[in-house]
């Protein structure tokens, strides 16, 4: 007989209605997206019969049963116990059970005494689910494929004992989910393919033991996911392929042990991601192929001991990524082929104990501030000019910086910074010393020239630069002529142009007067070049001498330039030759 046409929603797409109900059976029709998927028959069991079995310490087997308004709080009143007294259940089984209540389905402050507790394939419909401070004993706990419906789910301060805990494919409905301060014991813990609803999910201050922790392919909803201050124990931790939804994700102050932490292929959605003060332990940390969305990302004061941290092929949105005072430990740091085309990333007060791979696919801005580098920082990009903005300040380099100055466009990136010329000069000086150590002498020369230019500009304001003649003398003699001693070819060309220029003045300016009486040279042009050359190179006239004051003073000027430029050329050439 059909008792009810009313349809009750379990989740967004799943609903049910009771077709038949009596003291023996309950027949329920399940629908998905308004299509009938199953009609299932349950055995009806009176709630007070369950209470009697618990009180008599009999086995409680609710498998394939319809259970209505079950509440251990009501049971305590029924037997006259205090509301905080622990309820002991000798043996318990609830496979494919249908729990329903208009208020709470209450298993709070219960202790299961057998070695295995099973709720597999059960449904908690309509009511809120409360396992607050439950103790699951020493055995395995199975909530595989459980559907928790629309209400909140509370496993706060639960003790799961020493066995394995499994919530694989569990659907936590649409309400708030709480596992805060839960103790998961030393077994493996699995939430693989679990689905959390729209509300807040809280694992704060929970404790995992020696086993592995699995959240692979789990899906979270629209609110904050809180793993703050969680102890993930000594095993491996897997969050691979998790979708964290739209809310913030908080792992702040959590601790990982000896195992690896795998966040590969995770989608962090639209919220902020917080790993501040996280201790990642001794294992590797994998963020390979992660999508971080548009929220800000914080790793401030995080700690890695021995493992590497890997962001290869990761994708970042319109966000800021902060690594402040991070202790990176002995492992490598990898960002190769990661996409930060709309993201800003900043490292400050960090020590790089091992290699760092900054070969981004693209990056909007990279800021390195107060960094100590002990090994290799790699900027040898596969793509041309992937960085749009770059700055490092107070970098202490004990290792090496692998970079191609031209290919990476670092020179232009530093020059266009909105910082002082002194800060720019310091950056070029670090690069100059680094290239010298690596034997990249062409890059060293280029960095040195930029260092001297920024150092020169730092001594003058924009206004005084234009008016100060000493500034322009330095620009012309040291920069334009020989690029601060890095280009002997330029100095040589300047020497030749100087000789020809003065020869032209001796030849064509009327006031110039030179005595060629003792010379056997008859060609006037050759005479002028000869006089200019010996004046420039030797300051000795021999058979030719100036005949008036203007010519004599011009010869003095050329002689001085000759001494200066020849010395400049010698120093520049020898510097190149010795290297």
Model-derived features with residue positions:
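Outer-pore turret/helix-boundary of cation channels
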Residues: 493-530, 550
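Pore domain of cation channels
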Residues: 517-579
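Membrane-interface junctions
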Residues: 461, 479, 483-491, 556-559, ...
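Generic alpha-helical structural element
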Residues: 39, 420, 433-436, 490, ...
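Hydrophobic, well-ordered secondary-structure elements that form the walls
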Residues: 444, 505, 573
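Alpha-helical structural motif
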Residues: 94, 107, 469, 473, ...
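Transmembrane alpha-helical segments and their cytosolic interface motifs
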Residues: 465-508
């Amino acid at each position: 007989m059909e008792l009810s046409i009313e349809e009750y929603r379990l989740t967004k797409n799943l609903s049910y209605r009771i077709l038949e109900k009596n003291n023996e059976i309950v027949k329920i029709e399940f629908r998905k997206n308004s299509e009938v998927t199953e009609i299932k028959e349950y055995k009806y069991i009176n709630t007070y019969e369950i209470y009697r079995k618990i009180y008599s310490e009999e086995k409680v087997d609710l498998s394939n049963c319809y259970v209505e308004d079950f509440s251990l709080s009501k049971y305590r009143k029924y037997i006259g116990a205090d509301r905080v007294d622990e309820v002991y259940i000798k043996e318990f089984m609830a496979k494919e059970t249908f729990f329903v209540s208009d208020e709470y389905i209450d298993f709070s402050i219960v202790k299961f005494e057998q070695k295995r507790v099973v709720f597999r394939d059960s449904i908690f419909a309509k009511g809120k689910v409360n396992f607050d401070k439950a103790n699951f004993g020493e055995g395995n706990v199975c909530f595989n494929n459980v559907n928790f419906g629309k209400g909140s789910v509370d496993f706060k301060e639960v003790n799961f004992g020493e066995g394995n805990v499994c919530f694989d494919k569990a659907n936590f409905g649409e309400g708030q989910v709480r596992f805060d301060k839960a103790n998961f014991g030393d077994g493996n813990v699995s939430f693989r393919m679990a689905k959390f609803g729209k509300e807040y999910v809280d694992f704060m201050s929970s404790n995992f033991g020696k086993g592995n922790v699995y959240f692979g392919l789990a899906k979270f909803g629209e609110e904050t996911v809180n793993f703050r201050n969680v102890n993930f124990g000594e095993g491996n931790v897997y969050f691979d392929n998790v979708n964290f939804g739209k809310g913030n994700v908080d792992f702040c102050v959590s601790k990982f042990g000896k195992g690896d932490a795998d966040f590969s292929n995770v989608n962090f959605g639209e919220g902020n991601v917080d790993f501040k003060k996280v201790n990642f332990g001794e294992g590797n940390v994998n963020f390979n192929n992660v999508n971080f969305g548009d929220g800000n990302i914080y790793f401030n004061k995080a700690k890695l001991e021995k493992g590497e941290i890997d962001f290869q092929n990761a994708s970042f949105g319109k966000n800021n990524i902060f690594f402040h005072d991070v202790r990176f430990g002995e492992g490598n740091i990898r960002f190769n082929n990661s996409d930060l085309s709309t993201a800003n990333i900043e490292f400050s007060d960090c020590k790089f104990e091992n290699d760092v791979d900054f070969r981004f696919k693209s990056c909007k801005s990279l800021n390195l501030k107060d960094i100590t580098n002990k090994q290799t920082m790699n900027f040898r990009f596969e793509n041309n000019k992937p960085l749009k903005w770059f700055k490092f300040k107070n970098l202490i380099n004990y290792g090496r910086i692998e970079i191609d100055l031209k290919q990476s466009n670092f020179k232009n990136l530093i020059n266009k910074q909105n910082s002082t010329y002194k800060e720019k000069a310091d950056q070029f000086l670090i690069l100059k010393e680094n290239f010298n150590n690596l034997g990249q002498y062409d890059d060293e020369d280029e960095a040195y020239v930029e260092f001297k230019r920024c150092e020169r500009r730092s001594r003058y304001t924009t206004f005084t630069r234009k008016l100060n003649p000493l500034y322009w003398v330095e620009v012309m003699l040291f920069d334009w002529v020989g690029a601060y001693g890095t280009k002997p070819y330029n100095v040589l060309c300047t020497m030749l142009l100087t000789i020809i220029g003065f020869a032209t003045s001796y030849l064509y300016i009327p006031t110039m007067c030179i005595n060629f009486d003792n010379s056997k040279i008859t060609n006037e042009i050759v005479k002028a070049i000869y006089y200019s050359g010996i004046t420039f190179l030797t300051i000795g006239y021999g058979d030719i001498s100036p005949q008036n004051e203007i010519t004599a003073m011009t010869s003095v000027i050329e002689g001085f330039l000759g001494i200066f430029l020849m010395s400049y050329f010698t120093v520049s050439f020898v510097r190149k030759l010795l290297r």
